[in-house]
């Protein structure tokens, strides 16, 4: 059985970005117990191999490995992971010197309701909105958000949700539905029987939510903000 697991773990060295390959790799990582030192050690070795490859761009597989190692019950594994990736696996780039370490920590801890609130706060600041005057965005604010920052926020959500969440994932769903908003709300789980979900109790604050479920946007204010977000130049050649 252990040899079989070792063979399965070795498949994680493959750094394919195909949807099917990523799905299988995520399933392998999920089978690893947090208190199994030998499996965690092997996983840590593979993690080092993956992220130190020249010009390698991390994805949600690395995100789940990072979470599994960092949330393990072994101090040696935690120390190794923290030293290897002191700021996580996503480069925290910002055009406005925004600190994303706090968002990264919340996502790794799977504290999604706090991460969602913090995401909205950061978007408001990035758009240059005075929080004392209003704590929401107009569609005209969206273009003020730098490309680099929007991509960083999206990459954090994607990396730490097994590829399920983030603005780009939402955008892909919206485009696949030919920009039909009613179908979009239903698909990502923001409406039940055509009635907007009540915040926060009717939303899913874990990875069991529908694909594209998070981060949230207040659809009661209309579709213009999300439409502007999905049309942002951050997604050009992304």
From Swiss-Prot:
Subcellular location: Plastid, Chloroplast
Keyword terms, alphabetized: Chloroplast, Plastid
Keyword Plastid: yes
GO molecular function: tetrapyrrole binding
InterPro entries: GUN4-like, GUN4-like_sf
Single GO cellular component term: chloroplast
Similarity section: Belongs to the ycf53 family.
PANTHER family referenced in this protein's UniProt entry, alphabetically: TETRAPYRROLE-BINDING PROTEIN, CHLOROPLASTIC
Protein name according to UniProt: Uncharacterized protein ycf53
Organism of derivation: Porphyra purpurea
